[in-house]
Amino acid sequence: MLKNLFRKTKYITVSQKNIENYKRENTPTIPDGMWVKCNKCGEILYQNDLEKNYMVCNLCGNHFRIGAKERIKYLFDKDTFKEWDYKVKTENPLNFKGYDEKIENIKEETNLSEAVTTGKGKIAGMEVVVCIMDSKFMMGSMGSVVGEKITRAIERAIELRMPVIIFTVSGGARMQEGILSLMQMAKVSSALAKLDEEGLLYICVLTDPTTGGVTASFAMLGDIILAEPDALIGFAGKRVIEQTINEKLPEDFQKSEFLLEHGFIDKIVPRSDLRKVLAKLINMHKNSF
């Protein structure tokens, strides 16, 4: 009996790898992208519910940034949108180092050809020409192709006698294209001047963020200027302005609510109401088409 008392105890060795495998096999898995955290209130939101609510937080009303494809889905009558000029190719006129590779990588990641999608479609049965900028493609920066596509869309709107709607979201001019990028400000503005001469309607919808050269040109030229709630809209950054004038700016400076209060825009429209409001505005002006 004493002999059995001092006998070595039998045991099983479990490696760290076996423990990790056990945890992996027995831990419930949640598919990627099923839940999203609101970056304003911190609420964890179910992705499907968020999409049904136009990518707007149902707790705090925060408008998530959305791309061109989502806007087309929310805006147009089903299967009426026809894209234009998607084959226009971005060049590297200044031979900016790494620019070609960056463009190709972004194209693969986003499945977008450039930072703006243009075309025509129907809103409540009424045909319109639309240009939708997308922040996923180099933060919606305005290069020569962006300016060219928007200009072509405006020129076609004149030919077809249709109103133009532009959704803006941009970090400004694309630095990799230098002065050619800045030239697009005048180019698009000139096309809009011709649209105005023809008596056709131009509605601009400002989304978060709309800054730099886009703000300084076609974003502020609309006959009617709308904006989404809490959108950042301005030219230079807030800190740059504060350092320049040596003054502290209001907390809501450059927000769409601040711009509405000071007469820079006409109306703030929640995303869920945007299609209805645009349809009403187009219908009010349809005699000019």
From Swiss-Prot:
Obligatory cofactor(s): Zn(2+)
Q: Which molecular function terms from Gene Ontology are attached?
A: acetyl-CoA carboxylase activity; ATP binding; carboxyl- or carbamoyltransferase activity; zinc ion binding
Q: Where are the zinc fingers (C4-type)?
A: 38-60
Describe how the cofactor binds.
Binds 1 zinc ion per subunit.
Record's keyword annotation contains NAD:
no
Q: Which domain of life is it from?
A: Bacteria
Q: What class of enzyme is it?
A: transferase
**Which residue ranges does the record assign to the CoA carboxyltransferase N-terminal domain?**
34-289
**What EC number(s) is this enzyme filed under?**
2.1.3.15
Family annotation (NCBIfam families): accD
What is this protein's name? Acetyl-coenzyme A carboxylase carboxyl transferase subunit beta
The record's gene field reads accD
